Amino acid sequence: MAFRLAVDCLGFENHPREAIDAVLEYWSYHQELEFILVGDEKTFDGLDYLPKNITKQLASSCIDMTDTPLTARRKVNNSMQKAINLVRDGAADVVISAGSSAVYASLTYDGFGKIHKDVKSAFMSYVPTANNDWFYFLDVGANKNFTGKELYFLGLMADIFVKKTTNKISPRIALLNIGTEIHKGFDYHQEGYQLLNEDKHLNFTGFIEPRFLLDGVCDILVADGYSGNLVLKSMEGTFKTIARLLKQGYKRNPLAGLFSLGILKRIAKRFDYKNNAGAVVIGLNKLALKTHGSADKQQFLSTIRLAHTSLKSDLINAIKSSLDNYEK
């Protein structure tokens, strides 16, 4: 099937060519895909030729990182809204943006609507672990506040995603907390724990502390968006610091670095967040993905790859079907 991907090329910290070059590279390996690049006239300066499956849509403004959902709505024909509208109107199957997280969460919610009345949308990212595996982490920043029931639905939707996109038939679900004891946390932690634990279709393993996350003890990590974003950014910062310290160590002792270089390169590549940059905006009636505001070509590539995987899994229809059964 020829999936159509709309890419907002404006509103992030780097040059739009980072997004465009990622699209061109990914398309070179998947020429059955169609891409719609959304930007202003300057975005496409010097871009004299595009393959027939890659088209341009012109916008007259972009969403800045300083914009709020309110100020964004005053920017007529902005690139983010235009890319979202392509999916809303059926001209594309998924939208990708590196723009403001708050604005993107708001505009996709307004444009696509919730997939279920009890669901709150979330950014779902994926994180490598020490045992050569991954876990999916949500919410990492779409919404600050969740009820226990909304946390339960995050676990339910992520369970569907993992079953559809991996070979895991019973993914382990954990709920982020400051301790593993049942009484720890706020009221919404207690309610979320109870609902996840009572659903016998889910493999819920209980609360988990942040220090155990990279040990590979869960496949899905559920959290409110405030806590989730703090933990994710802390991990990304830690990975960057370790990489910097290793480089400093090589300079001081090149011989020791030479003997360990192969192993350390593999570790650095695995935990480089640029290779794991995409987040699915889960809980909406249409498919949207978010990448970092500092995204470069590599981060856009990893986000496009995740978007393609999500499309092939027919994620939205799978979630809708499961939630319909929940009602029954």
UniProtKB/Swiss-Prot annotation:
An example Gene Ontology biological process: fatty acid biosynthetic process
Functional pathway: Lipid metabolism; phospholipid metabolism
Enzyme Commission number(s) of this protein: 2.3.1.274
Subcellular location: Cytoplasm
Top EC category: transferase
Keyword Transferase in annotation: yes
Main location per the UniProt record: cytoplasm
Keywords, comma-separated and alphabetical: Cytoplasm, Lipid biosynthesis, Lipid metabolism, Phospholipid biosynthesis, Phospholipid metabolism, Transferase
PANTHER family, A to Z: FATTY ACID/PHOSPHOLIPID SYNTHESIS PROTEIN PLSX, PHOSPHATE ACYLTRANSFERASE
Family per record: Belongs to the PlsX family.
Name listed for the protein in its UniProt record: Phosphate acyltransferase
Lineage: Bacteria, Bacillati, Mycoplasmatota, Mycoplasmoidales, Mycoplasmoidaceae
